A protein has these predicted regions:
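Ser/Thr/Pro-rich, low-complexity mucin-like regions
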Residues: 25-44
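Compact alpha/beta protein-protein interaction domains typified by the UBC
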Residues: 1-7, 21
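Hydrophobic/aromatic beta-strand patches that form the interior of the parallel beta-sheet core
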Residues: 258, 282-284, 328, 348-350, ...
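A structured beta-alpha segment of the ubiquitous adenosine-cofactor-binding alpha/beta core
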Residues: 313-347, 353-355
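Glycine-rich adenosine-cofactor-binding loop
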Residues: 245-288
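Glycine-rich phosphate/adenylate-binding loop
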Residues: 49, 55, 59-218, 344-348, ...
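N-terminal charged helix/coil linker that caps or initiates catalytic domains
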Residues: 199-257
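Glycine-rich phosphate-binding loop and adjoining beta1-alpha1-beta2 segment
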Residues: 286-321
Length: 504
């Protein structure tokens, strides 16, 4: 939804529609401009309108910088920022951004997560400055020599003094950045100015801090600068999750979840939990990624041969850097012993391994007083039906809902040829199912996990997702589950556990 009039049009979006609609839209914008220009118009309304779009107007006057900026956490106040680049990212993401932070350790930790290897910062330059604007500067962007006069009325005297000191101390650096946080509450937009020595080629990126023992410096103590604008991304929790209006994000930040199984179901569950703001994830899986996994796994060909838990750990650290993630490349039966502290601290365990020995082990621990909540989730063959058993109660035990071989007693599909496809290896098999169906079941499981982490519910739940059950017969199976309402192709059911049977 557009929040302002945006008199110049919506970014660079092409105009579409009928000729009449385009002309009417242009006339409407022109009429608004005329109305706002009249002596009788409200100066306050005009001021608010232009302030709302101030960044748009500044960007129209400043060319884009050759380098974007990644700000590692939003600073709490005005001050200098250290700047680092890493040439390895140039090959990985098609450009070499500048990483800004108040201290070098924050940048090093962040780059280590992104690159998957330790980064040594040798000489971080104080090439950035962060400041909060008290009021809005004029929408007419300043010339380089007018920058400080343009900013001065809109900064506190202390912030302005700090900015001048930083500018003088950093004048030997050929490319610098000033991050201007707009007026308003915490989390206001940031406009980033790039101050570059005029001797630099227009599209030349500078390298700072990593691998080079020296920083690039200007030839003169008072360089003649140019002004451009750098795209800026704030890589902190508040910004990354800013479009999720879940009121329980603070609760999720401290939550600890262990996901047992990083296959086609467990991996997307872990990804959903990370992107939902769960603060601490531990991933458990002993297996390696193979080519046959790629059709329905979130990992790709570059991870073939790697342990699934370790590969997903690296993937999530890179993609969602606000989450603390640990990999345990082992069977959960061993992890319960060797990594006991991780399980003792856990709030929730989600097991998606489709391995009855590991599932039974966790139910046994749950039945004798383990404090963590437990969700066992799996898909029936061909991923048209998925289930999750949720246990919040300390002494819950679902083992009796399964036969001795781990087959669920209340399944919704029957398959004369068997539930799994054997592989040419000792005891190895897989449950057939496409990536689309598994992904939908993963969303159901992740939603159940978030609910358990953010509520005080002590209920035991059986959640099932059913999709296109008519396809079961086409796949030579039999559907024996509940009928869907007329016109529905999918359905999710929530109810207490089914009747408990004693194990045979």
């Amino acid at each position: 939804m557009k929040t302002g009039l945006c008199l110049h049009g919506f970014q660079e979006k092409p105009v579409s529609g009928s000729p009449e609609a385009i002309v009417n839209d242009s006339l409407r914008r022109f009429a608004k401009i005329v109305q706002m220009s009249l002596p009788t118009s409200s100066s306050d309304a005009r001021k608010v309108e232009f302030e709302r779009e101030s960044m748009s107007y500044w960007k129209m006057q400043h060319r884009a910088s050759a380098q974007s900026v990644n700000l590692v956490q939003r600073p709490s106040g005005a001050g200098a920022l250290l700047a680092v680049t890493d040439p390895r990212l140039d090959r990985r993401i098609g450009g070499e951004p500048v990483w800004l932070a108040q201290n070098a350790d924050a940048i090093a930790s962040h780059l280590e997560a992104v690159l998957g290897q330790r980064v040594k910062i040798r000489d971080a330059a104080r090439a950035g400055f962060y400041v909060k604007l008290e009021t809005y500067p004029d929408i007419k962007a300043p010339l380089p020599g007018e920058l400080f006069d343009w900013l001065r009325p809109h900064l506190t005297s202390e912030s302005y003094s700090q900015l001048l000191s930083w500018f003088g101390e950093s004048c030997s650096i050929v490319s610098r950045w000033i991050a201007l946080e707009l007026p308003g509450d915490a989390g206001a937009p940031i406009y980033c100015l790039n101050l570059r020595d005029r001797s630099l080629a227009q599209n030349k990126a500078v390298k700072l801090g990593v691998r080079a023992g020296r920083r690039v410096k200007a030839k003169f103590s008072n360089p003649d600068i140019t002004l451009s604008q750098s795209a800026i991304n704030i890589l902190d929790r508040a910004e990354i999750l800013s479009r999720d209006r879940n009121s329980k994000l603070d609760v999720l930040a401290s939550a600890r979840v262990i996901v047992v199984g990083q296959g086609s179901l467990g991996a997307p569950v872990a990804l959903h939990l990370a992107r939902s703001g769960v603060g601490h994830l531990t991933l458990v899986d002993p297996d390696q990624l193979t080519a046959s996994n790629l059709g329905r796994h979130v990992l790709g060909a570059s991870d073939l041969g790697r342990n699934k838990a370790e590969a997903m750990c690296a993937r999530l650290r890179s993609d969602v850097p606000i989450v603390t993630i640990k990999a345990i490349p082992s069977y959960v039966e061993l992890a319960l012993i060797k990594n006991r502290e991780d399980f003792e601290k856990a709030d929730l365990i989600v097991v998606t391994s489709a391995d009855w020995e590991s599932e039974e082990t966790l139910w046994r621990a749950k039945s004798v007083g383990a404090s963590w909540k437990l969700i066992q989730a799996w898909s029936e063959p061909h991923a048209l039906v998925g289930h999750a058993l949720v246990a919040a109660d300390v002494s819950a035990d679902a083992k009796s809902l399964f036969e001795d071989n781990g087959r669920f007693r209340h399944k919704y599909t029957n398959w004369p040829r068997g539930d799994s496809v054997p592989l040419p290896a000792c005891g190895q098999s897989f449950i057939p199912g496409g990536g689309l169906g598994v992904s939908a079941i993963a969303s159901m499981v992740a939603a159940a996990a978030i609910e358990q982490l953010t509520s005080d519910s002590r209920d035991i739940l059986w959640i099932s997702r059913i999709s296109n059950p008519q396809r079961v017969s086409a796949l030579e199976g039999e559907y024996v589950g509940p009928e869907l309402p007329d016109g529905a192709t999918e359905m999710t059911l929530r109810r207490p556990w089914p009747e408990v049977f004693p194990n045979a």
